[in-house]
């Protein structure tokens, strides 16, 4: 799984860029305007009467996505949802799919210039993959903005926690590729101790290499799979792809999310570069049923200016009663 793969886009693999033309806030604004990031800027009243900026989704989202969105600040340059929007923008504009030195900050000049001059909206619907480990069976769920949950299938994650929980955007895709790597085979601790004791006693033994993997003793078995289909890389060498198994729904892989053939083919056709992939220990309910009413159009939103206004009828020389007054602010036309 970890050999014949595209280099995962991380800050460590990128050279320093020149003076950036765009700040992270401006990049988010462009991605929102062109619908790569399906949000609407809104304002809200914070402590001490200060107005703060936030975002509202353009469609209804399930509880699990609400929890995910709340777990990362939109201002974080490595926010996986924002980074995924950037990857989709890059793919649509035939640019290298990569982050900057710091997520969406420090982008290469070619990508910044493309953002500045871009006019093409995202041609694909926004999608999100949720992989749940519990309750069993393990499953993959596909959410599409404006349509809700549109697909579900059994899936396999990695043995011995080889598929960590988290969220990453799809950064590379291939309909057909090869994977080479090492698969961890668990061995009993007693077997390791017996081998070490026999070797220390001077017995002539065939050399065996044991290693520690996620708090388990293992032996590694090399694999070379030349025909892996419908591959979506999201976290280094980990990908969502087809792999033939006798059954699905429990950990079996070396770290990837394995799917049955028909499911992998359908997922590949429905998602795109930048689709966030969330691996979760368990689902966050309640789940919205498939076919529930999702919004196809953005929810109406106004930027509000809030001020305090005195209520003379309730005021006196010793006390003043105030109420908040909302005034819609006209957005400048661009």
PLM region descriptions:
Residues 186-334:
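Exported/periplasmic cell-wall-interacting domains
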């Amino acid at each position: 799984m970890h050999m014949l793969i595209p280099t995962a886009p991380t800050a460590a693999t990128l050279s320093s860029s020149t003076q950036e033309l765009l700040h992270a806030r401006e990049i988010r604004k462009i991605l929102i305007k062109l619908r790569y990031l399906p949000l609407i800027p809104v304002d809200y009243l914070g402590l001490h009467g200060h107005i703060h900026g936030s975002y509202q989704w353009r469609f209804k989202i399930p509880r699990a996505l609400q929890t995910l969105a709340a777990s990362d600040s939109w201002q974080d340059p490595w926010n996986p949802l924002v980074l995924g929007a950037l990857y989709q923008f890059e793919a649509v504009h035939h640019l290298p799919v990569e982050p900057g030195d710091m997520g969406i900050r420090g982008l290469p000049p070619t990508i910044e210039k493309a953002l500045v001059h871009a006019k093409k909206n995202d041609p694909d619907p926004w999608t999100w993959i949720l992989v749940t480990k519990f309750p069993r069976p393990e499953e993959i769920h596909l959410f599409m903005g404006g349509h809700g949950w549109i697909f579900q299938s059994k899936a396999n994650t990695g043995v011995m926690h080889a598929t960590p929980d988290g969220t990453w955007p799809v950064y590379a895709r291939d309909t057909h590729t090869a994977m080479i790597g090492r698969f961890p085979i668990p061995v009993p601790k007693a077997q390791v101790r017996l081998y070490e004791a026999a070797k220390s006693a001077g017995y002539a033994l065939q050399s065996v290499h044991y290693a520690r993997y996620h708090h388990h003793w293992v032996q590694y078995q090399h694999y070379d799979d030349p025909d892996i289909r419908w591959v979506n890389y999201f976290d280094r060498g980990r990908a969502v792809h087809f792999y033939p198994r006798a059954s699905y729904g429990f950990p079996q892989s070396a770290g990837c999310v394995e799917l049955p053939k028909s499911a992998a083919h359908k997922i590949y056709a429905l998602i795109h570069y930048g689709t966030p992939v969330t691996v979760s220990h368990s689902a966050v309910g309640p789940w919205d049923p498939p076919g529930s009413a999702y919004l196809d159009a953005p929810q109406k939103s106004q930027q509000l200016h809030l001020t305090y206004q005195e209520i003379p009828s309730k005021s006196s020389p010793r006390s003043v009663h105030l109420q908040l007054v909302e005034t819609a602010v006209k957005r400048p036309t661009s």
